[in-house]
Amino acid sequence: MALVQKTEHQSHISRNVHALFIRNGRVHPLHPFKMNCSVYNSELTVYSKESTIMSERATAPTTAPAATSAPVASATSAASAENLPEPNAKLTTREKKWIVYDVGNSAFVMLSTAVVPIYANSLLQSAGQSNIVSTWGYAQTIASLIIAVMMPVLGSMADVQGMKVKFFTGFFLTGVVACCAMALPLSWLIFLVVCILATVGLNGSLTFYDSMLVDITSNERMDRVSSHGFAWGYIGSTIPFIACIALIFGGPSLFGWSTVACTRASFVITALWWVAFTIPLLTSYKQVHYRATAGQTGEAIRGTFAELGSTFRAIRKNKPLWMFMIAFFFYIDAVNTVISMSTSYGTQLGIDSTHLVMALLITQFVAFPSAIAYGKLAGRFGAKTMITTAVIAYICIVLFAAFFLRSATEFWILAILVGLFQGGIQALSRSYYGKIIPKNRANEYYGFYDIFGKTASIIGTFLVATTTSLTGNASVGVLSIAILLIVALIFLLLQRDPTRK
């Protein structure tokens, strides 16, 4: 169906209505927002049927029914409609400062994929633990479960004006502090707990970071900007990673430190890199789309709990969105499981840690141009088409890992294949979702996006860990990932793409 665009006349009406009912900084009791009336939310993408309902409510008399359970008003900063660049224009300063956070946090993602599992493996072996894959998998499952429970509620709260950056900062600091704490001499159990905290901090910050995308760019540029974020994250993270690897392997001879001490120092280096590339975003970000509070902030936050159910029902009623969410649930499960379990899987197969680390480094270099290329291809063929292509490719990758991966050479091949599609499917999923949700409720919707992704991660890592434990064969656990991808492919093929006419 045709998309609804806000006209100049509608903008004029919205400004006049807003000015009429707000006096001395307070919202009048008869403000249309207090009566559950939607007044032309800026850049809100809806279907024609839904827009008709919105229009009827916007013109309803002031004797409309009573207020909703959540005393909040939809609002959009005036900056949202100003100075928007052309779709093919160069990246703006605001977009670049958003992108560099991917450079910062990806350093920890890289470290937690390549170095942390190996270090945890040494702690587990020293403590007499044998099943590395299942133990690490259960730790990742716990972290995913915590995020899945927290994010919808916190995401809804963060849609209130000024709250998004506060929640983002809180989770970012949690991740950084936990990353530094990993450098302490800890037992294997305490180390896993700290790893869980660091993972929660990372993924929590990413939920709010992803939702910032709707504030810093337009629909037409989302695929491109999101792809650049992942691309520069991949290539940028190699700088601290190479420094850490050089320290781990060269530190003992250069400085006389033990390998363990050098590994712990790499955690601190990564945390400092993460902080450095977060500062530009923290000092420049402005929340454009938000729900302005009607009364006290605490009152509005309490109202968000009542809105969670209605938001989920709205997602269910929007069939294209719901179909995509189900598909996303299954395919991102597979992608995240491959990322989090690859090093442990290689270790279980007896592949040397040097080969594991270097192969994962190759993944980063391959993913950089691939993610940018995916963004360009999405502009030509559509984001959904490219996502579907990546899902098919991942099915082939999983089959290769399960049946043919037995040596370091094959692990290198796997790393290259993953690099070709990993960044593209992640970037386009983030931007495609941002196009089909209400912008001024982005955090709330991205909270559900995150719960689908993190709940899926629980299933994926738990499935691999449990299957490996029961069969004693890690390859069987990896093979189970293909089932999830096939289910995702079916739903993608059945979904109608709302972004294309």
Q: Predicted segments — roles?
A:
Residues 80-95, 286-325:
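Juxtamembrane intracellular "pre-TM" segments in multi-pass secondary transporters
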Residues 85-144, 320-359:
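Helix-loop boundary and gating motifs at the non-cytosolic
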Residues 150-162, 369-383:
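Helix-to-loop junctions at the C-terminal end of transmembrane segments
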Residues 166-180, 385-400:
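Structural signature of the two symmetry-related core transmembrane helices
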Residues 183-194, 403-414:
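Helix-loop junctions at membrane interfaces in 12-TM secondary transporters
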Residues 204-217, 424-437:
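Intracellular juxtamembrane helix-capping segments at the cytosolic ends
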Residues 248-272, 466-485:
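A membrane-interface helix-boundary motif in multi-pass transporters
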Residues 273-284, 479-501:
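Multi-pass alpha-helical transporter architecture, strongest
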